[in-house]
């Protein structure tokens, strides 16, 4: 089973329940595990080194990274940079009309601006079909 690392700001995670649920269902149908780091792990404020060590290990063990950056996040930017340095495909997601990150897009395999969870699922679904047919 392939594995996708989902990078999202901890403080904004609850705003994207519909998007995460939609992707989780789509990926399950395509035999891909969606690992949402902020859902799987919890760290105390003094555990930042351990947190990043675990994050980097999870990225190393993933086939690609999906970054939700409707709201910019330093932590997600670090995860993108790490995945890019490890030659992992990076998919940069943001809601249409949100601020565009040139640094994140510069490290991305694909940039997906979406309206809602249905639009996101359809666009990612097309990308998965292209990748699986090639």
Where are these regions (language model features)?
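Conserved catalytic or regulatory cores that recognize and/or transform ribose-phosphate-containing ligands
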Residues: 1-134
